[in-house]
């Protein structure tokens, strides 16, 4: 096995651990996959930099969507990143930025770019169509 394929396999294992620990709400494990915790949510412009900010993001998003979960579709590799296609699902059961819970479910296909330095994630940058989620949460409103 070459060094490149070995690094690729280790990075993929880190991303899988990251995503699975998010599903389990084991955010200490999620934070442990980062060399430096940083989330960039492109559609909203939100940047959560550092362990405290990332943990606050987890708390906010899981208060609004306590059953939030991801379902992996595929992974692609670049020299310094793992690009993940997945479906994010959840039920709006708590307040979110001034919006009261609707009780409605959403499902949205997304892309996350996990940037690496060595074997540690230094940024998760997430891309998705916010209108897809909003339309599902507002359906019938």
Model-identified regions with their sequence ranges:
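C-terminal and inter-domain tail/linker signature
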Residues: 1-141
């Amino acid at each position: 096995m070459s060094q490149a394929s070995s690094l690729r396999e280790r990075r993929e294992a880190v991303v899988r651990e990251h995503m699975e620990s998010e599903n389990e709400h084991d955010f200490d494990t999620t934070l442990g996959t980062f060399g430096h915790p940083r989330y960039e949510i492109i559609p909203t412009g939100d940047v959560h930099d550092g362990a405290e900010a990332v943990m606050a993001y987890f708390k906010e998003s899981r208060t609004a969507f306590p059953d939030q979960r991801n379902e992996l579709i595929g992974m692609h590799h670049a020299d310094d990143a793992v690009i993940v296609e997945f479906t994010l699902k959840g039920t709006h059961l708590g307040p979110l930025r001034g919006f009261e819970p609707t009780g409605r479910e959403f499902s949205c296909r997304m892309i996350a770019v996990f940037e690496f330095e060595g074997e540690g994630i230094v940024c998760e940058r997430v891309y998705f169509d916010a209108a897809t989620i909003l339309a599902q949460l507002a359906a019938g409103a």
